C-alpha cells in the first residue's frame, strides 16, 4: 500500500525526477498495451452538478488524458447528441499516434454511449451499437470472444435515446453543440443518418456529411405565412375557379 500511495503521489504531482529515482525493483518494465477502448471520455470527474462541479474539478485536473507511447491502438466511441457544456468530450490528437487512433461518432448522448441507461431498457438497442463496435475492434486486435457473441446485443439506430435532460440533466442549463471532425481520426458510424441533422457541428472531413441547410431541423419553429388580405383573396378566387386554358 505504501508503494501504491507513493506512485499515486508522483503521478498526481507530476514529479518526473521522483519517478526516475524510484527503485526499479518496485516497477514493472515497459509493457506494451495492445488497445485502450473508452466510451465518450469527458474528463467529468468529481460532482458533475451545476456550480458544485467547480468545487471538485481542481482536484482532478492533474490527470493526463493523452495516450502513452506504450499504447498501440486507441479506440473511442463519442456521443453526437450530448449538449451539456460540462460534458465536453476529450478527443485525442492523433498526431502523436498516426494510424493508431480511431474515434467514432454515434447517435446518442453521454449515457447512451457509456451504457448508463438507469433502467430505461428501451434505449438498450441504441446503446448496444457503440458497444458492439468497440468489442468488434477488440476482437480484431486479438481479444478472444465467444462465437456468435453479437447475437446477445441487438442493435437499432432508431431506438430512443436516454437523452441529456432526464433527472439531474435538467439542471445543466449551459449547453453547446459538440464539434465533430476536427481530428483526422474521427468518423461517423454507418448507423448515423446522412445527411446528419444535428445537433453536433460537423467540420473537417465530416463537414460534407452535414445537411446543405443546417438549420432546416428548426423549420417547425418558423413563423406562419402571412394571412392574405380580403382584397388578395377576392382577386385569387376568380383565377382559381377559371377553367384551364380559359
Enumerate the predicted regions with their spans:
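Active-site- or binding-pocket-proximal scaffold segments within functional domains
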Residues: 1-246
Amino acid at each position: 500500500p505504501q508503494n501504491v500511495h507513493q506512485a499515486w503521489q508522483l503521478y498526481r504531482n507530476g514529479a518526473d525526477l521522483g519517478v526516475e529515482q524510484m527503485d526499479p525493483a518496485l516497477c514493472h518494465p515497459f509493457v506494451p498495451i495492445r488497445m485502450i477502448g473508452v466510451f465518450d471520455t469527458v474528463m467529468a470527474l468529481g460532482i458533475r452538478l451545476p456550480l458544485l462541479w467547480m468545487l471538485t474539478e481542481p482536484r482532478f485536473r492533474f490527470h493526463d488524458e493523452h495516450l502513452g507511447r506504450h499504447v498501440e491502438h486507441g479506440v473511442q466511441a463519442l456521443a453526437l447528441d450530448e449538449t451539456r457544456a460540462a460534458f465536453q468530450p476529450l478527443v485525442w490528437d492523433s498526431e502523436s499516434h498516426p494510424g493508431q487512433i480511431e474515434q467514432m461518432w454515434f447517435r446518442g448522448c453521454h449515457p447512451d454511449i457509456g451504457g448508463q441507461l438507469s433502467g430505461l431498457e428501451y434505449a438498450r438497442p441504441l446503446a448496444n451499437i457503440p458497444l458492439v463496435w468497440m468489442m468488434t475492434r477488440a476482437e480484431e486486435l486479438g481479444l478472444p470472444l465467444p462465437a456468435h457473441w453479437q447475437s446477445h446485443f441487438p442493435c437499432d439506430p432508431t431506438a430512443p435515446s436516454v437523452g441529456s435532460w432526464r433527472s439531474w440533466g435538467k439542471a445543466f442549463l449551459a449547453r453547446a453543440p459538440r464539434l465533430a471532425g476536427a481530428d483526422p481520426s474521427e468518423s461517423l458510424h454507418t448507423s448515423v443518418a446522412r445527411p446528419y441533422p444535428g445537433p453536433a457541428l460537423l467540420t473537417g472531413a465530416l463537414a460534407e456529411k452535414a445537411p446543405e441547410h443546417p438549420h432546416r431541423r428548426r423549420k417547425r419553429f418558423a413563423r406562419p405565412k402571412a394571412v392574405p388580405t380580403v382584397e388578395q383573396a377576392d382577386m385569387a378566387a376568380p383565377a382559381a375557379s377559371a377553367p384551364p386554358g380559359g
